[in-house]
Amino acid sequence: MTRHLTLCFILLVMLIDKSEACFCDHYPWTHWSSCSKSCNSGTQSRQRQVVVNDYYWKNLCDKLCIKQETRECNLQTCPINCVLGDYGTWSDCDPCTEKQVKVKSVLRPSQFGGQPCTEPLVTFQPCVPSKLCKIEETNCKNKFLCDSGRCIPSKLECNGENDCGDNSDERNCGRTKPVCTRIYTPIPSVQLMGTGFHFLAGEPRGEVLDNSFTGGICKLVKTSRASNPYRVSANLENVNFEVQTIEDDLKTEFYKNLISFEKNKNEDSLSVDERTKFFPIPIFHFSEKNEHSHYSSAFNKVIKASHKKDSSFIRIHKLIKVLNFTMKATDLQLSDVFLKALVHLPLEYNSAVYSRIFDDFGTHYFTSGSLGGKYDLIYQFSRQELQNSGLTEEEAQNCVQYETKKLKFLYMEIHKEDTCTKNKLSEKYGGSFLQGSEKSISLVQGGRSQQAAALAWEKGTSGPEENVYSEWLESVKENPAVVDYKLAPITDLVRNIPCAVTKRNNLRRALQEYAAKFDPCQCAPCPNNGRPRLSGTECLCVCQSGTYGENCERRSPGYKSDAVDGNWGCWSSWSACNAAYRRSRTRECNNPAPQRGGQSCGGKDQQEEDCTVSIMENVGQPCINDDEEMKEVDLAEPEAESGCSQPPLPENAFTWNEKKLYSVGEEVEISCLTGFTAVGFQYLRCLPDRTWSQGDVECQRTSCLKPVVQDVLTISPFQRVYQIGESIELTCPRGFVVAGPSRYTCKEDSWTPPISNSLTCEQAILTKSKDLCPPGQKQSGSKCICMSPEEDCSAYSEDLCIFDGGSSQYFTSSACKFLAGKCLNNTQSHFVHSGSCQEGLQLEWGLERLKLAVNSTKRVSCGYNTCYDWENCSAHTSNCVCLLPPQCSKDENQLYCVKIGSSMREKTVNICTLGAVRCANIKVEILNPGRCPD
C-alpha cells in the first residue's frame, strides 16, 4: 500500500513539473458569508469562483487550490442583561430618621456589555414613628442619665465638658470642677480614627466611635513640631507622633496580570489574625455610595484599561505617616448616631434593616493604624513592548523606581541607571521608560483629591510637573487618611445596649448575607480563563496574561493554553439546625468546572457552624442582654460520685430543666420539638447502678417547619408550621421559574419531594428567546417557528390557569404549552389568571370575564392575556389593568340593562362600564342585553 502511494506521489510531481503551476488567484474569492452567530464565536466562510476549463485541468488547479476558507467571527460573548427582583416589604419606621426602607435584590448582574440595572436597590419613604429617638442603655442605676438617653459616669457631671453630647450634664451646675487646668485642642483629624470601614468596598464610612469624648481624664500628648500638647480621646490607648519616615522606602512590584495584583493587595489589607477571623472577600468591590468609592472605582479603571491591550503592570508605592494610634480593647464610647442606629434595630431579624448598618457605618472599625497618606501608582505597559525592550522584570521595576526619583517626585539621591535609558522601549520614547507605559492610574490615599489625581498621567501627555508630589505631600497634612491599619468586626461594638446579644447575632447573620451580595460567584465564567469580579450590579472580567478584550475574549499570538481553571459557584442556603446544634452549607466547583487540565478550586466545598434551635414554636426573638449570655461550657463540671449523667434521648427530643447529674430515683420527662409529638411512655428514672430505666418513646412528626429556601423564592402560603397533608407553592419573580418542582407536601417523614438547599430561580424558557422570537416560538435557522408543546416544553415554566372553550373546563397548564398552542392556532384555550387554578374570587372573575369578552369590541394582546373594552395593557407588567368606571367612554355600543350595588336599581351601561364595575368586585345583575325599558 505504501509503495502505491509513493508511486502516485512521484507521478503527481512529474505532472506538475511538466505543467505550468496553477495561479489560484486567477479565481477570485466570494465575499465572506454572514456570521453563523451574532455572539459567542461564530464562523463564516467564502468560496473561490472556479471556472472549470482547460487551464483548470491542465494545471491541476483542483489539486493545488484551496476552494473554501472559514474563519471565526463575532468572538465577543453574548451580553447578559441585569435583572432585579421585586421590592420587599417596608421596614418599621425609624424614629431618628422618620423614614422606612425597602430593598430589592439583584437576581442576575449584567455582564459582557448587557443592559445595566438603572433602578435603585434601596428606596425610602417618610413615615410617622411610634417611638421617640432616644438612646436606651442597660444598667443606668448609678450613672447620670443624659437627655438623649445615654448614661455616663456620675463623676462627669458638672465638670465643664459636654460629656453627654447634648450638654445636659452641665445644666443647673452651681460650681464646675474642671478636669484640666486649661482648654487643650484635640488631636487633629482624631474623628477619622473613629470612622467605620467598609471592608467589601475598601473605603471609610460613617462615624462609629465618639473620639471627642475624653471621659473626665486630662491625658495629653505632645508632638515635637507643636509647642502646645493635644488632649487625648478616652477611646485611644496610645498615640505616638514620633513617626520616622524612611526616605528611601519606595517599593515596586511587577504583575503579569491583575489577578495576581488583586490577590496580593487583598492579603496586604488585613493583619494575619484578622484574615482568619473574617471572611476572605476582596476589597475591590462596588459601594452603593460610589461617589465616595475612590479606591474601588480606581481599580475598576485599571481593569477596563487592561481590556484595551495585552498588558503587564508595575506598581510603585510609599507610606507617609504623621502619627500612629491604638484603640482601647474595651469600654469604647460609641458615636451618638451609631448608638441610636443600634438601639432602634428591631428585635425580629430583618435583612434590609440590619444591612443598612453596613451601608452607613461599614463592616469593621479601626483597632490601630496611622494617619497620613499613601503614594500609590500602577503603570500599565504593553506586554509585547516590555518583552521587546530586553529588560527583565526586576530591571523594569528598577527603571520605574529610578525615573520616579529622577523626576523629583520624592527628592531622593539617585544612581544613574544606563539600562533604563538605553533599552528599546526607552529609546523609542526619548529616553523615558515611564513615557513608554500606556498610562498610570492613581490609587493614592490621603491628601486633596485634585493633587492625588494629578500624580497620574495618560500616554501622549507631558506627565506630572515636578512640584505635584510636594503639593500632594503638603495636602496630606490637612487631609490625612487612615493607612497601615488593623480592623475588627463592627459587631464587636454591639455592647451595653438593650438586647445586645440578640442584635449582635442578628448583625452577624446579616453580615454573611450582605457579603454574599458582593460575591462574584453570581457572575458567568469569563472567556480564556479570566476571573469575574462583581462591581455593583455589573460583572467585570479580569484577564489572564496574554489575553485582553472587553471580556478577555482576545488572545495574543503567544497564548496557546486551552485549560480552564475551576471557579466556585455560590454557597447553598444553610441547612436546618441538627440535633448537635450545627448547621452546614455547600458549594460546587462548577462556575466553571475544571476543563482540559485546568486547576481545581482552592478551599473547602462545605462549611459548618454552631446554631440554635427553638424547642417550642417560635413566637418572636427573645431579648438577650450581655449579662444573660452564659453557656454550659462556662459552668464547672460536677463531681459524679453518685447518680446518673444525662439520659440518651430519641431523635428530635429534649428534657426540661436539663442537668449534668441526676440523683438516684429522679425522673425526667421526655418532650418533643415543635412539629413532633411523643408516642409511648415519656418518663425515665435514674437507677442505683447509675443507668436509666428503658422507656419506649419516640417523637413522631405531626407537622413540618417552614423550609429554608433562597431569598429569591417566595413561599405560599407563608406559615411557621405546616400540618401533615398541607402543601406549599414556590414561586419566582416574573420572567423566572423554579429550577425544579414548585409544589411540595408535608408528609410524615418530611417535605415531599425533598427541598434542595440549592433550589433557585432560572430564566423561563419563554424569556430566554424573547429578544429573538415572539413568545411561543423558537428560532430555526433565520426564521421563527412555533414551539411543539410536547417536545419543547419539558423545561419548567410558570403555571397558568387556562379555560378550554371546547370542553368548558378550566385546568392548570404550563405557560410554554399555552403559548405554543396559541401559536399553532389553538383558539379554544383562554388565559384565566397566572398561577394554578384554585377556587376563589380570582377564578370566578376570570371565568365571568371570558363570558363577557364574547361581545367585546376590543382585543389587544398583552403578555399571556388579551385585554378587552374595560381594560388597558400595562407595559410595565404585561398585565391587563381594569379601568375605573368613570374612565369608560360614553359610547352606546354593546349596551346592557343591569342592577348595580345594594340599591339594585336598573341602569343602562355599555360593556366597558359593566366590565369595570365587575372587576371592582361590585355586585351586578345583568337583566338583558340592550337598554333598560323606560
Swiss-Prot record:
<dbReference type="GO" id="GO:0050778">
    <property type="term" value="P:positive regulation of immune response"/>
</dbReference>
<keyword id="KW-1053">Target membrane</keyword>
<keyword id="KW-0106">Calcium</keyword>
<dbReference type="Pfam" id="PF01823">
    <property type="entry name" value="MACPF"/>
</dbReference>
<dbReference type="GO" id="GO:0001701">
    <property type="term" value="P:in utero embryonic development"/>
</dbReference>
<feature type="glycosylation site" description="N-linked (GlcNAc...) asparagine">
    <location>
        <position position="855"/>
    </location>
</feature>
<feature type="glycosylation site" description="N-linked (GlcNAc...) asparagine">
    <location>
        <position position="872"/>
    </location>
</feature>
<feature type="disulfide bond">
    <location>
        <begin position="24"/>
        <end position="65"/>
    </location>
</feature>
<dbReference type="InterPro" id="IPR020864">
    <property type="entry name" value="MACPF"/>
</dbReference>
<feature type="domain" description="Kazal-like 2">
    <location>
        <begin position="876"/>
        <end position="934"/>
    </location>
</feature>
<keyword id="KW-0204">Cytolysis</keyword>
<comment type="subunit">
    <text>Component of the membrane attack complex (MAC), composed of complement C5b, C6, C7, C8A, C8B, C8G and multiple copies of the pore-forming subunit C9.</text>
</comment>
<feature type="glycosylation site" description="N-linked (GlcNAc...) asparagine">
    <location>
        <position position="324"/>
    </location>
</feature>
<keyword id="KW-0768">Sushi</keyword>
<keyword id="KW-0677">Repeat</keyword>
<dbReference type="Pfam" id="PF21195">
    <property type="entry name" value="EGF_C8A_B_C6"/>
</dbReference>
<keyword id="KW-1052">Target cell membrane</keyword>
<dbReference type="InterPro" id="IPR035976">
    <property type="entry name" value="Sushi/SCR/CCP_sf"/>
</dbReference>
<feature type="disulfide bond">
    <location>
        <begin position="862"/>
        <end position="873"/>
    </location>
</feature>
<keyword id="KW-0479">Metal-binding</keyword>
<feature type="disulfide bond">
    <location>
        <begin position="793"/>
        <end position="816"/>
    </location>
</feature>
<feature type="domain" description="Sushi 2">
    <location>
        <begin position="702"/>
        <end position="763"/>
    </location>
</feature>
<keyword id="KW-1015">Disulfide bond</keyword>
<dbReference type="InterPro" id="IPR000436">
    <property type="entry name" value="Sushi_SCR_CCP_dom"/>
</dbReference>
<feature type="disulfide bond">
    <location>
        <begin position="499"/>
        <end position="623"/>
    </location>
</feature>
<feature type="domain" description="TSP type-1 2">
    <location>
        <begin position="81"/>
        <end position="134"/>
    </location>
</feature>
<dbReference type="InterPro" id="IPR002350">
    <property type="entry name" value="Kazal_dom"/>
</dbReference>
<dbReference type="InterPro" id="IPR023415">
    <property type="entry name" value="LDLR_class-A_CS"/>
</dbReference>
<feature type="disulfide bond">
    <location>
        <begin position="146"/>
        <end position="164"/>
    </location>
</feature>
<dbReference type="GO" id="GO:0045087">
    <property type="term" value="P:innate immune response"/>
</dbReference>
<dbReference type="GO" id="GO:0005576">
    <property type="term" value="C:extracellular region"/>
</dbReference>
<dbReference type="InterPro" id="IPR020863">
    <property type="entry name" value="MACPF_CS"/>
</dbReference>
<feature type="disulfide bond">
    <location>
        <begin position="704"/>
        <end position="746"/>
    </location>
</feature>
<dbReference type="InterPro" id="IPR003884">
    <property type="entry name" value="FacI_MAC"/>
</dbReference>
<feature type="signal peptide">
    <location>
        <begin position="1"/>
        <end position="21"/>
    </location>
</feature>
<feature type="domain" description="LDL-receptor class A">
    <location>
        <begin position="138"/>
        <end position="175"/>
    </location>
</feature>
<dbReference type="InterPro" id="IPR000884">
    <property type="entry name" value="TSP1_rpt"/>
</dbReference>
<dbReference type="InterPro" id="IPR048831">
    <property type="entry name" value="C8A_B_C6_EGF-like"/>
</dbReference>
<feature type="region of interest" description="Factor I module (FIM) 2">
    <location>
        <begin position="858"/>
        <end position="934"/>
    </location>
</feature>
<feature type="domain" description="EGF-like">
    <location>
        <begin position="523"/>
        <end position="553"/>
    </location>
</feature>
<dbReference type="InterPro" id="IPR002172">
    <property type="entry name" value="LDrepeatLR_classA_rpt"/>
</dbReference>
<feature type="binding site">
    <location>
        <position position="169"/>
    </location>
    <ligand>
        <name>Ca(2+)</name>
    </ligand>
</feature>
